[in-house]
């Protein structure tokens, strides 16, 4: 975004979209690595697909009368007249990729992916217009055991990240479409009688998507809904049994949960199981992770009749929660430079290049930075300290001719002179490599 201030051009990021600076990336990478390791351990494979899809994909999958499609998508027409959209969620694109590349043909893939999503919502704490999700999808399994597996995966993620004590699992079953249509009529009838108590948002949804009113944040409407018909009373027997078995398996796995009869998802493709992991540590109750079954979506988008279930974790909210509880679980080693190489004299270039690459080859996990700014010894030491370096290696003309190295610990100021072939053994001992 370009703004003009006092006749000068001021360039800044688009509202609701933020930069992730190096000091923050360290925490992001840690979280992503934990999630990747867990998903890979459960046998899930990574898939990558475009952030831009045909707009019709989201209209058909999410639903044309949802807030996402009606108000929140970033949609544009390209130079060839194609109607395109920046993905507001990942499941639709993942399913499209699976159909297009025949991933579901005689297979039951289990996939994970992560990346940016885009929605034009009002920016606030934990809600951005470009946000990032880590998601998993499992295809071809119809029983509640796969639902449980995904919940167990998320539960394990929270434990590994040290945030499990701050999250609550909420569950519900929204049944089949036929059950929801019966319930929809009952709910509309109830709300019509109390229309004078509805806010503008609920009135707008009354006939287009009344079940979304169940997810309201308005306290007065929540009190009203306490007297409304309950969806569970209208579920078909198969959906009831599916949900009962889901709860039974979670009990066996010692997973604590709350059945929330008002829990619905904002995307039309969901059926039967829906779940959310929520926290109240970010102010108003915030969803950290959400998921559920979408057994009809693949067929709806032109594939076969293949059941599926998935979840999405909001990475920004995980980061916020971990910062709020001041989690010390992050490995801060990557914040620092292990060794900073200072170069002085005439012959430093040849020797420092040879030395630094030798160290990197033998100790690939060591963080080594070579000073390229020039200047005297003090100036280079200052740069080493600004980069949070633990040790410096000093290379000058004398070292070049003697094939030696000065290794200095910045905090203690202790230093020693080592031979070229001794530096690897010394650093291995220091860093237990």
Curated annotation (Swiss-Prot):
It is found in: Cytoplasm. It catalyses: tRNA(His) + L-histidine + ATP = L-histidyl-tRNA(His) + AMP + diphosphate + H(+). Belongs to the class-II aminoacyl-tRNA synthetase family. Homodimer. The keyword Kinase does not apply. One of its GO terms (molecular function) is histidine-tRNA ligase activity. GO terms for biological process: histidyl-tRNA aminoacylation. It comes from Blochmanniella floridana. Pfam families: HGTP_anticodon, tRNA-synt_His. Its main location: cytoplasm. SUPFAM superfamilies: Class II aaRS ABD-related, Class II aaRS and biotin synthetases. The keyword DNA-binding does not apply. PANTHER family: HISTIDINE--TRNA LIGASE, MITOCHONDRIAL-RELATED (PTHR43707:SF1), HISTIDYL-TRNA SYNTHETASE (PTHR43707). This is Histidine--tRNA ligase. Keywords: Aminoacyl-tRNA synthetase, ATP-binding, Cytoplasm, Ligase, Nucleotide-binding, Protein biosynthesis. GO terms for cellular component: cytoplasm. It comes from the Bacteria. Its EC number is 6.1.1.21. The gene is hisS. The lineage of its organism: Bacteria, Pseudomonadati, Pseudomonadota, Gammaproteobacteria, Enterobacterales.
């Amino acid at each position: 975004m370009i703004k003009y201030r006092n006749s000068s051009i001021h360039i800044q990021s688009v509202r609701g979209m933020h930069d992730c600076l190096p000091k923050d990336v360290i925490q992001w990478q840690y979280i992503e690595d934990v999630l990747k390791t867990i998903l890979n351990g459960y046998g899930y494979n990574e898939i990558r697909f475009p952030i831009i899809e045909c707009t019709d994909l989201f209209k058909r999958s999410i639903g044309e009368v949802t807030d996402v499609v009606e108000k929140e998508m970033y949609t544009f027409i390209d130079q060839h007249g194609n109607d395109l959209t920046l993905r507001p969620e990942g499941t639709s694109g993942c399913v499209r990729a699976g159909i297009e590349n025949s991933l579901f043909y005689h297979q039951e893939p289990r996939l994970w992916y992560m990346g940016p999503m885009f929605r034009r919502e009002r920016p606030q704490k934990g809600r951005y217009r470009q946000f990032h999700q880590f998601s998993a999808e499992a295809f071809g399994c119809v029983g509640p055991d796969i639902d449980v597996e995904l919940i167990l995966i998320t539960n394990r993620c929270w434990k590994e990240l040290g945030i499990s004590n701050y999250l609550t699992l909420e569950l519900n079953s929204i049944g089949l479409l036929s059950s929801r249509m019966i319930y929809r009529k009952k709910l509309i009838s109830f709300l019509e009688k109390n229309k004078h108590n509805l806010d503008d948002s609920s009135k707008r949804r009354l006939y287009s998507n009344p079940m979304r009113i169940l997810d309201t944040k308005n306290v007065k409407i929540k009190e009203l809904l306490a007297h409304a018909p309950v969806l569970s009373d209208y579920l078909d027997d198969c959906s009831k049994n599916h949900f009962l078995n889901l709860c039974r398996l979670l009990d066996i796995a010692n997973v604590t949960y709350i059945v929330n009869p008002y829990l619905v998802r904002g995307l039309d493709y969901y059926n039967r199981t829906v779940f959310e992991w929520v926290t109240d540590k970010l102010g108003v109750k915030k969803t950290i992770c959400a998921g559920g079954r979408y057994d009809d979506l693949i067929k709806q988008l032109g594939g076969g009749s293949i059941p599926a279930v998935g979840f999405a974790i909001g990475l920004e909210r995980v980061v916020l929660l971990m910062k709020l509880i001041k989690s010390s679980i992050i490995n801060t080693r990557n914040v620092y430079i292990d060794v900073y190489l200072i170069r002085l004299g005439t012959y430093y270039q040849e020797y420092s290049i040879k030395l630094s690459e030798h160290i990197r080859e033998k100790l690939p996990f060591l963080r080594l930075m070579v000073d390229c700014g020039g200047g005297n010894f003090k100036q280079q030491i200052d740069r080493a300290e600004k980069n949070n370096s633990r040790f410096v290696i000093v290379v000058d003309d004398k070292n070049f001719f003697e094939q030696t190295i000065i290794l200095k610990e910045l905090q203690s100021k202790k230093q020693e002179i080592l031979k070229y072939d001794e530096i690897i053994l010394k650093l291995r001992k220091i860093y237990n490599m």
